[in-house]
Amino acid sequence: MNKVVLIGRLTKDPELKFTPGTGTAVASFTLAVDRRFKKEGQQEADFIPIVVWGKQAESTANYMSKGKLMGVSGRIQTRSYDAKDGTRRYVTEIVAEEVQFLEWGSSNNNSMANDQFNNGNENGSMQLPDNNDITPIDDGDIPF
């Protein structure tokens, strides 16, 4: 089994690229994930590289920015490549299968989307519509 679940903060804005040929979106970013234990009263964090593909990559790049809290679930993957100096380099990263935006907003001027989500509330909770437009249903009308 290869399954990872993380909650952390973005260390910088996600970097969005598109693959040559197919044009598939891929976003990469680093999550700062707090450790459970404090060393000498100081909170320590691990900085974990994340890669996300497709529509989730585009959404992540559009709506998330440095410092925002997000959740990621996926798998650990190790890959290698040849560097310009001729040495072989190894990279261990998380390939995200699911991302959750735990804080909204972006420095890329996406405040309109954030305002629509928040629906005008300062605390970020959504307002439910008034019940004036709801038609009452008789239990006898339900087929089960």
Swiss-Prot record:
Residue span(s) of domain SSB: 1-103
GO cellular component: nucleoid
InterPro entries: NA-bd_OB-fold, Primosome_PriB/ssb, ssDNA-bd
GO biological process, one term: DNA replication
Listed Polar residues bias regions: 112-134
Region annotation (Disordered) ranges: 112-144
Database matches in PROSITE patterns: SSB
GO molecular function term, any single one: single-stranded DNA binding
Top-rank taxon, per record: Bacteria
Entry-linked Gene3D superfamilies: Nucleic acid-binding proteins (2.40.50.140)
Keywords noted in UniProt: DNA-binding
Subunit (UniProt): Homotetramer.
The protein's name: Single-stranded DNA-binding protein 3
GN (gene name): ssb3
